[in-house]
Amino acid sequence: TRITVGGVDFAVLEDRKFKSGPAGKIPQMGPRPDHINDPKYDPKTIDLPGLQLLGPRQEKFLKNWSEDWTNAEMKGVLSQTAFCGAVHMHGGPKSRLLADLDCNGWPQTPRNKAVELIRRAWAVHLCGDQHLAVVVKHGISDHGDGPYGFTSPALVNTIYGRWWHPLDEQSGPNPVPNSPLPWTGDFKDGLGNKISMIAYANPENRNDEKKRADGYGIARFNKKNRTVTFECWPRFSDVRHGDGAQFPGWPITVAQDANDGRKVAGYLPELIFANGKNPVVQVIEDKSGDVLYTVRARGGRFQPRVYSKGKHTVKIGLQKPDAKTLAGLEPKPKSAAGELNVSA
C-alpha cells in the first residue's frame, strides 16, 4: 500500500510473507536454514530461478507507484528489513556469519529487481529489523549505482547484538571522507550484493545499557532542497546537545537525485516549464524500452540525464507522465544540450 505525508509519498511493502524460504530450496550450510557459515559457500549457488522476494504483485505495485506522483514532491519506501546483509557478527562480537538469508539481500536476483524499482523514483529505503543501525548505498550493476538505505537501530537491543566488522579490518574503496568510523567504503555483503557502507553503530559493550547501540532513527525530507537527512540517536542521548549526541557518522544528508548513481552518458535538453510549474517527468531509453526514472521537477525546470547514447523519450504530466511526449531526444554534453520550453 502507500501513504502520503506532507507531500512525501511512501510505498509500504510486505517483505516477509511473499519471500521464498531457504529450507528445502537450497542446501543447509549452517546451524539453521537461513544462516551460512560454510567456508566453501559460493553466493551464486543460492540465487536460484523461481525464488522470490516481494513477488510479482508487489513488483507491479512498485512500478506503478514510481510513476504516480499525485500530491507528492518526494518519495520513500518503507519495509521491515534491509535489501542487503550489512552485518558480520551475529549475537556476539566474535560470532562471525558468512551470510544471513533472513535479510532482503537474498534471493539476490529479486533483490536487485526491488532496488532497481526503488531507484526509478529516486526514493530512499527506510527499515529496521537488523539489530544494527547502518546507512548504505545500494549497488546493482556497480557500487553506488542504486538508492540509499537507512536501517534504524532497535529501540531496546537486549536480545541480539550485531556488528559491522570486516575480516581484514580495513576500509573499502571510496571510504567516506573524514568519517569517524574506520570501515566505510565499497564492499560486497555475504550474499555478493554490492553495498557502500556510509555509517554503522556497533555496540561498544553489550552489558552496559548505555553502550549497546540501541536507539532510534529519524529521516527528515526537505522538499525545498530535495534532500533527505538521516539521524541516528542513542537511546539515552540528550537531543538538546545537538548533532554531537548522535551516533558517530550521523547525521547524513543525501540529495534526492543521488538515489540514482548510474554513470551519466549525457544530457537531454533542459526543460523549462510555463508558469514555473513542476510537472512529473519520465525518461525512457528507446533501445530497451526501459523507464530510467520518473520524478517531479523543481524550480520550474528539469534537465534529464541519461546513461547511454542513442534516442530517448521524455513524458510529462502534472501528476503522472501522461500529458505530453517528447520523442527522439539524443544526449549531448550538458553545455551543448540546449533548452526546450514546455507547456505542461
Which residues are covered by each model-predicted region?
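Long, structured stretches of catalytic cores involved in phosphate-ester chemistry, encompassing
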Residues: 1-343
